Amino acid sequence: MKKVQDYEFWFVTGSQFLYGEETLRSVEKDAKEIVDKLNESKKLPYPVKFKLVATTAENITEVMKEVNYNDKVAGVITWMHTFSPAKNWIRGTELLQKPLLHLATQFLNHIPYDTIDFDYMNLNQSAHGDREYAFINARLRKNNKIISGYWGDEGIQKQIAKWMDVAVAYNESYGIKVVTFADKMRNVAVTDGDKIEAQIKFGWTVDYWGVADLVEEVNAVSDEDIDKKYEEMKNDYNFVEGQNSSEKFEHNTKYQIREYFGLKKFMDDRGYTAFTTNFEDLAGLEQLPGLAAQMLMAEGYGFAGEGDWKTAALDRLLKIMAHNKQTVFMEDYTLDLREGHEAILGSHMLEVDPSIASDTPRVEVHPLDIGGKEDPARFVFTGMEGDAVDVTMADYGDEFKLMSYDVTGNKTEKETPYLPVAKQLWTPKQGWKQGAEGWLTLGGGHHTVLSFAIDAEQLQDLSNMFGLTYVNIK
């Protein structure tokens, strides 16, 4: 995957001086043990680092300032071992600009009935310490994540891991840069939007570059690099010449590889992590990037067609959250409305990411009427089965809104010999009719990101971090 930086999360434990130095030493010892065992569990995608026992407004404020300016720190996990007066947390929490997880847990997972005394009660006050702390977060309208349960349970560790992925995506969002080659498809409404507001709210930079600038990079790719990649791909994918001559198949496939290298170099040299193309503006290119775009998406670059920069940025963002697993640019295309068979066939002209392929992708070359260029090479495959979420973002003028519904992914009932593209069949879990009407009522777009690796809870957490309206259509 296109790499993100190495992140860590800081663990801050709440207490106070009221209980004495011996108790505070026990608090620190227990907190460090929790951190060590969380890291040793191998369930978390990023390391946790014990930072301090928070006892005063001053040291809480100082640690939150450190979190803000340390680019390596993706967020804070707090735990109240004892009672920790929440007035001490006000200033630091107000200043915190990164994701906050309140882990409402206890060092032991049981009550030691035979030995419990008031010393034990003073030390293990998470039950009401968490309530004091949660109140001030609610009072400050912090919208932070809360996970309650025993820290050693695998289910709780999985919840922490999912939140970590969201927090890292949030941090990485402010570095997402989208290059749009040409503008969006003419006269289309839903792919438009306020780029300035997107940069203010999400950190997304969206830049226009002319196709001629890309053509220079594409033409500069060496034949040696293209030939080497072509031979490598023969080992990973099925090459199907079909009705094409061997010469045409090889030339058209190699041209897509040329576009792949050209796009990749263009983006890497300028710091872009997502891109869009537009079939209406391909001057100087032999083909609409198809296989090229699919190869780049497989590496973790965000993409959307027709100049849809919002979906391209969202694709990159959710790929980060999913570690680039089974998370793809998608488009609703055609419907099965037979009773008992209701489904949506999703696809695009060419550009669907092979990370959801249920079979070995085939490299094929076929005509594409749209765009007026040479027959483009593309990956052809059938999508996977399983639970997924279909996500889109739209700009309503006064706000951005994120929306999704849960879907069941299925394979197509039959092959589609006259539709040589990547495709995915799915049905909204609430039923096609209810899902469609909910989506249309909200004005959700036709370009989406479909993911088998993230869920609606993570989308809600992400929206809370951004202060973004999120609708989970049910």
From Swiss-Prot:
What is the name listed in the Swiss-Prot or TrEMBL entry for this protein?
L-arabinose isomerase
Q: Which organism is it from?
A: Pediococcus pentosaceus (strain ATCC 25745 / CCUG 21536 / LMG 10740 / 183-1w)
E.C. code: 5.3.1.4
Stored Pfam families: AraA_central, AraA_N, Arabinose_Iso_C
- Which reaction is recorded as catalysed by this protein? beta-L-arabinopyranose = L-ribulose
User: What processes in GO biological process is this protein linked to?
Assistant: L-arabinose catabolic process to xylulose 5-phosphate
Q: In which pathway does it act?
A: Carbohydrate degradation; L-arabinose degradation via L-ribulose; D-xylulose 5-phosphate from L-arabinose (bacterial route): step 1/3
Q: Which family does it belong to?
A: Belongs to the arabinose isomerase family.
